[in-house]
Curated annotation (Swiss-Prot):
Organism from which the protein derives: Cupriavidus necator (strain ATCC 17699 / DSM 428 / KCTC 22496 / NCIMB 10442 / H16 / Stanier 337) (Ralstonia eutropha)
Keywords attached to this entry: Isomerase, Magnesium, Metal-binding, Phosphoprotein
Coiled-coil regions, chain positions: none
Protein name: Phosphoglucosamine mutase
Any Gene Ontology CC annotation: cytosol
Function: Catalyzes the conversion of glucosamine-6-phosphate to glucosamine-1-phosphate.
Family matches, as PANTHER family: PHOSPHOGLUCOMUTASE (ALPHA-D-GLUCOSE-1,6-BISPHOSPHATE-DEPENDENT) (PTHR42946:SF1), PHOSPHOHEXOSE MUTASE (PTHR42946)
UniProt: Mg(2+) binding residues: S106, D245, D247, D249
Length: 447
């Protein structure tokens, strides 16, 4: 399906530039409201949507625009204020609402923002519904009669409800007493949520990245910038550090020695913990970028591994297709569908902590069987529109390289979606093997 406005994770861009302008966002809210009203069942009354946001200064402006759009279409609005993206998904489902909307650009800088929708079930909107909304945006915006306008009000207990939900995903027989955690909230939506979750379960919590000012979200803190977390873990003598991104749907973990663990390793850890608890795990889903060492380690444990396109949306699609529950990507998007309908950094952290408590081991001990393969990435500049798949020299080089790597590495070649570059990535057991193979492939492209 060709999309004009919706990307793989909603509508996103630079604030003040199309499409992230107040007038467009109001039209977007109105269009989504019309689609929801049209699909509402007879006798259910007006649809109601939940709107949450992260801590970007532009969130106030875009929240007001969305509110105007929805209410002008005859849709009621509930406002949560700053709340993690997965919190909006949870509350949308728990409150039996028509849809949820998040104003966030996730891990991007503060000057970007975006709009993401959740269905009544707390899932990403189906493509067909997004297509309906895009079509409705192009129609004239007609305000509902005064008697049919929607109302807007704030939910004052949204953070508390979500905190209790997060805690409910942690085993009731376990607690976090005696554990010292550093929690990095990226000056984002989890700043007033995550520390409370872990503290209420018994942990001694040191918070960093928890003073948002509207412009410092993701700036030197959080899952995409873990250096300060590593420093804080060592400085405070903490057992573990947890880093979330701006909307708290990603997780990175640091151990007491300052070693960083990414989403690939954490996915393996959670799968193994489910198995240790006696739960059958027939398969797990990663992406094209998931480290091969994780795939091989899972297969040794009898777990089938499937690769989706990059993006948690596609991981979720593959999980649903197979009725599996566990998936994720190296960036820290982890899906535990037996706990939540969407990726949730706080819930994922609780699954990691549950594994540590259940086993009595450290992260390093639990992940002894997974040594990530070294990766070599070479970006080769090409002419715009270049078709690397038809390049005879590259295909010949690939045909020679892949048999040498079989069972010990892999090749991934893909075109960049944003610049005239072909990305050549090789993973192998040994760094020298990966570098040699990647250079051979890049040279075949004329690098």
């Amino acid at each position: 399906m060709t999309r004009k406005y919706f990307g793989t994770d909603g509508v996103r861009g630079r604030v003040g530039e199309a499409p992230i302008t107040p007038d467009f966002v109001m039209r977007l809210g109105h269009a989504a409201g019309k689609v929801l009203a049209h699909g509402a069942k007879t006798g259910q009354g007006k649809p109601t949507v939940l709107i949450g946001k992260d801590t970007r200064i532009s969130g106030y402006m875009l929240e007001a625009a969305l509110e105007a759009g929805f209410t002008s279409a005859g849709v009621h609005v509930l406002l949560t204020g700053p709340l993690p993206t997965p919190g909006i998904a949870y509350l949308t489902r728990a409150l039996r609402l028509s849809a949820g909307v998040v104003i966030s650009a996730s891990h991007n800088p503060y000057y970007d923002n975006g709009i993401k929708f959740f269905s009544a079930d707390g899932d990403k909107l189906p493509d067909a519904v997004e297509a309906e909304i895009e079509a409705a945006i192009e129609e004239p915006m007609v305000c509902a009669p005064s008697d049919d306008l929607g109302r807007a009000r704030r939910i004052n207990d949204a953070p508390g409800r979500y905190i209790e939900f997060c805690k409910s995903t942690f085993p009731h027989e376990q607690d976090l007493y005696g554990l010292k955690l550093v929690v990095d909230c990226a000056h984002g939506a989890a700043y007033h949520i995550a520390p409370h979750v872990f503290h209420e379960l018994g942990a001694d919590v040191v918070s960093i990245g928890n003073q948002p000012d509207g412009r410092n979200i993701n700036d030197g803190y959080g899952a995409t910038a873990p250096a300060k977390l590593v420093e804080a873990v060592k400085a405070h003598g903490a057992d573990l550090g947890l880093a979330f991104d701006g909307d708290a749907d990603r997780l990175q973990v640091v151990d007491a020695d300052g070693r960083l663990y990414n989403g690939d390793e954490l996915l393996y850890l959670i799968v193994r913990d489910r198995q240790a608890a006696g739960q059958a795990v027939p398969g797990a889903v990663g992406t094209l970028m998931t480290n091969m060492a994780v795939e091989l380690a899972l297969k040794r444990q009898g777990v089938e591994f499937v690769r989706a396109k990059v993006g948690d949306r596609y991981v979720l699609e593959e999980l649903n297709k197979r009725s599996w529950t566990l998936g994720g990507e190296g960036s820290g998007h982890l899906l535990c569908l037996d706990r939540h309908s969407t990726g949730d950094g706080i819930v994922s952290a609780l699954q990691v902590l549950a594994a540590l408590r259940r086993s009595g081991k450290t992260l390093a001990q639990l992940l002894e069987g997974v040594r990530l393969f070294p990766q070599t990435l070479i970006n080769v500049r090409v002419q715009k529109g270049f078709d690397w798949q038809s390049h005879a020299g590259l295909q010949a080089a690939r045909a020679a390289v892949e048999p040498e790597l079989e069972g010990r590495g892999r090749v991934l070649i893909r075109a960049s979606g944003t610049e005239p570059v072909v990305r050549v990535m090789v993973e192998a057991e040994q760094a020298e093997m990966a570098e040699r193979a990647a250079r051979r492939l890049a040279d075949a492209l004329g690098a």
